[in-house]
Amino acid sequence: MKASIRVKLETLVERYEEVQHLLGDPDVIGDQNKFRALSREYSQLEEVTQCFQAYEQAQEDLVAAQEMAQEDDEEMREMAQEEIKDAKEAIERLTDELQVLLLPKDPNDERNCFLEIRAGAGGDEAGIFAGNLFRMYSRFAEKKGWRVEVMSSNEAEHGGYKEMIAKVSGEGAYGVLKFESGGHRVQRVPETESQGRVHTSACTVAVMAEIPEADLPEIKAADLKIDTFRASGAGGQHVNTTDSAIRITHLPTGTVVECQDERSQHKNKAKAMSVLAARIIQAEEARRAAAVSDTRRNLLGSGDRSDRIRTYNYPQGRVSDHRINLTVYRLNEVMEGDLGCLIEPVVLEYQADQLAALAEQN
């Protein structure tokens, strides 16, 4: 292990012990915001501290086994060789784990997020598939213990949605779901298809971190165009007799957000503003990322329609992730919210790319 890495790890262990002490301080316990922030930091430091302690123990075990290998007793030497082998394997495994734990963290990873699903090409079937995707993510969130709140929805005439925006609240929601941004394509026989032909439809998914109020960009009132209208359901029928729905246009960027799910115009405006701010920040971050480098694979989808990341093929019961050439024949389980088999391999590839980038820098 490099000396610089060891110094960094020792610093993190010191901070872990300091935070552990602070959490027992009555002044901290009495300040809920500070206590919550330190508890979050403690849980983040705990994993790397335990991993480093296990690494140090494996190093000690290796030294002890190497000393045992010098014994005169043949049986002891054989036992020592086994222990040397085990210790070296543990050191190698723990070194890899520590490298991943030391990768730069996205400060947004622990935050809640906005999940935006839009029907694309494919007519009615695209809207139905948008509904399927929302159900899939809702089931996944339920399994993770997260909460899903509909922010805005525009129902399609024959089921599903033209557009759906939901807020997903829970620890690490953005860090997990951010890999879902991009184009999602479905291949299946629509219920209305009498000839049994397979149709291809598409939806786009965009995942944006919810930004704390203190970190929100300043949005000038003069830069906003705010329209009010009556909320409507599928087929255009009115479900509200007052102009409670809100459409906000950010004139400098052309970003538009609609919200009509609340009966109160004030609540719809508040929801729309939070989504608008998240969209503006995401667009700026995407622009910066594109300017920095286009040479390395971007496993974080843009949410753009042309950025196809996944295909769901119903006749074959398969789901393919085009970013990492992964195919799994577990379509039914995936649509019921078992997304781990798709998300985890992408996360591992993303970490491998980060490690490769760090190696190039060094």
Swiss-Prot record:
PROSITE patterns: RF_PROK_I. Its main location: cytoplasm. One of its GO terms (cellular component) is cytoplasm. The modification N5-methylglutamine is found at Q237. GO terms for molecular function: translation release factor activity, codon specific. InterPro entries: PCRF, Pep_chain_release_fac_I, Pep_chain_release_fac_I_sf, Prokaryotic/Mito_RF, RF-1. Methylated by PrmC. Methylation increases the termination efficiency of RF1. SUPFAM superfamilies: Release factor. It is found in: Cytoplasm. It holds the Pfam family RF-1. Gene3D superfamilies: 3.30.160.20, 3.30.70.1660, 6.10.140.1950. Keywords: Cytoplasm, Methylation, Protein biosynthesis. PANTHER family: LD18447P. Peptide chain release factor 1 directs the termination of translation in response to the peptide chain termination codons UAG and UAA. Belongs to the prokaryotic/mitochondrial release factor family. This is Peptide chain release factor 1. It comes from Aliivibrio fischeri (strain ATCC 700601 / ES114).
